[in-house]
Amino acid sequence: DLVAIGADLRPGTVLEAYRHGLFPMGVGDLGGPPVGWWRPEERGVLLPGALRMTRSLRRSCRRLRVSVDLAFDDVVAACADPDRPGAWITDDVRLSYGALHLLGWAHSVEAWRDDRLVGGLYGVSVGGLFAGESMFHRERDASKVTLLALVDLLNDRYADRRLLDVQ
C-alpha cells in the first residue's frame, strides 16, 4: 500500500525507509516521479531453509556458475529493461541502489553461463532482513538459481533470525 509520496532517494533516506518496512517505487509512468513509499499489508517472506528444489532446478544449478556482487550494475540494468512487463526501475532508482551497493547495503547475486550474465537479483540487506527488489533471467531457471544461492548465503548460524522479503 502507498503510504507517502515525495522525499529523495539518497542512501540515508532509503535505508531509514527499509528500517520502517517501506520501499521506494515511483508512482508515475514506468515508475517515474514522484517517488512513492510503499508498505504492503501482506508481504511475500521466505525463511532460509524453507525452500524446496525440484530435480530440473537442481540440474540448472549444476550448469550455471553463481557469483555475488560481481556485476551489480549489470544486474540492475537488466532488471530495469523498459521492455519488461511492469518496468519501474528508473535512472534515479539505479543511481540510488548503486550508491547503496558502494556503501555495502545493496547486493546482487548473478548467474553465468560461461562469461555471459544469464540471470540475477538484487536487493538491500538491513539487519536480518534481505529485501529482494528485482530479478531477471535470460535462460530458464537462471533467476531461481540466484534465489537459491541467496537463500544458501542467508542460511548460516543466524538463519533463525533472518527473513527474505520478496515483496
Segments from the language model and where they lie:
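N-acyltransferase acceptor-side catalytic subdomain
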Residues: 1-167
